[in-house]
Amino acid sequence: MEDKTVELQFITHFTDTYSYYDSARMALEGGCRWIQLRMKDTPVDEVEREAIRLQGLCKDYGATFIIDDHVELVKKIHADGVHLGKKDMPVAEARGILGKEFIIGGTANTFDDVKMHYKAGADYIGCGPFRFTTTKKDLSPVLGLEGYRSIILQMKEANIHLPIVAIGGITLEDIPSIMETGITGIALSGTILRAKDPVAETKR
């Protein structure tokens, strides 16, 4: 399967300091070229308004624009793709709606999750959490480096080739050791937004 991911993915997160738009803009200014709009528990019309703004911003930077959860919205506005969490629509159902031209990512916490998404036609996996994180409710069991090594090894044994993006409580210092496990990329949110200079943090 063609690798449609990039090494750094940024997931928007609303804070007291930054709006969704501002957080995405700073990540893009810092060199990130993959933005995922994540607005859980928000009315779909609000998500659509924000998505259209961010889609234009991503086009200006030549970045990939992914929307979390909202499959029909992705199709409606022609975003680049959708990311589906464990409680969202199944990947196979989303693929049936979107067809082959859209990117579909799925969340995984175990090798069985990865295998299921692979068979369903996912383009990449968001795998985590690496450690405890406050940016997500209903957290799955923490994986750590050993969890990633185990999943990557089982994928090799099963001849499954799929980009795996690590997510969940990752700091800048964690990235070299995570990448050594065979992980394809890193997804960040809070680490960038908590920095004194989010643009500089993204560049680092």
Range-by-range predicted roles:
Residues 111-141:
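Histidine/lysine/aspartate-rich catalytic loop segments that bind and position anionic ligands
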Residues 127, 165-170, 186-190:
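Glycine-rich beta-strand-to-loop/alpha-helix junction loops that act as flexible
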Residues 84-92, 132-155:
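Flexible, gly/pro- and Lys/Arg-enriched active-site loops
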Residues 1-89, 96-111, 115-123, 150-153, ...:
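Conserved N-terminal beta1-alpha1 strand-loop-helix module at the mouth
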Residues 143, 190-191:
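Contiguous, function-dense segments enriched for cysteine-driven chemistry
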Residues 181, 185:
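C-terminal binding/interaction regions
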